[in-house]
């Protein structure tokens, strides 16, 4: 036979376990995936860029096989390409087509996977051939225009 006191104690434990179970998934849900963190970095690139069109993720290198700590910086390496969407359209990059002969940028740096305090330290270089020069004494070479864009967002 169960006493009222034992029943009350069992009810409290059940309530504590329920609350603990509800709290744990929300804590782990605050960690971004590697891809999500890179997409946020691309969004920051688009926000801070002064160029007329926005960029979209083209290629993402493999994630590092590090620890799963969302607060520790993760090395990232990816390429973005210019889209046909203007900065003024406010359209998500994923809905924009790549621009034919659009600029390509190689981006590297670190991101943290913490959804609330996500940090990005990304450097992007664009490399695009702009002309072929031919001199009588040398083989043709591509002249390259390089520009470095640095993104540092700390929250």
Curated annotation (Swiss-Prot):
The keyword Cell membrane does not apply. GO terms for biological process: antimicrobial humoral immune response mediated by antimicrobial peptide; defense response to Gram-negative bacterium; defense response to Gram-positive bacterium; innate immune response. The modification Pyrrolidone carboxylic acid is found at residue 30. Keywords: Antibiotic, Antimicrobial, Disulfide bond, Pyrrolidone carboxylic acid, Secreted, Signal. Gene3D superfamilies: 3.10.450.10. Residues 1-29 form the signal peptide. PROSITE patterns: CATHELICIDINS_1, CATHELICIDINS_2. Residues 30-143 form a propeptide. It is found in: Secreted. Pfam families: Cathelicidins. GO terms for molecular function: lipopolysaccharide binding. GO terms for cellular component: extracellular space. It comes from the Eukaryota. Disulfide bonds join 85-96, 107-124, 146-154. Large granules of neutrophils. Potent microbicidal activity; active against S.aureus and E.coli. Belongs to the cathelicidin family. PANTHER family: CATHELICIDIN (PTHR10206), CATHELICIDIN ANTIMICROBIAL PEPTIDE (PTHR10206:SF2). This is Cathelicidin-1. It comes from Bos taurus. The gene is CATHL1.
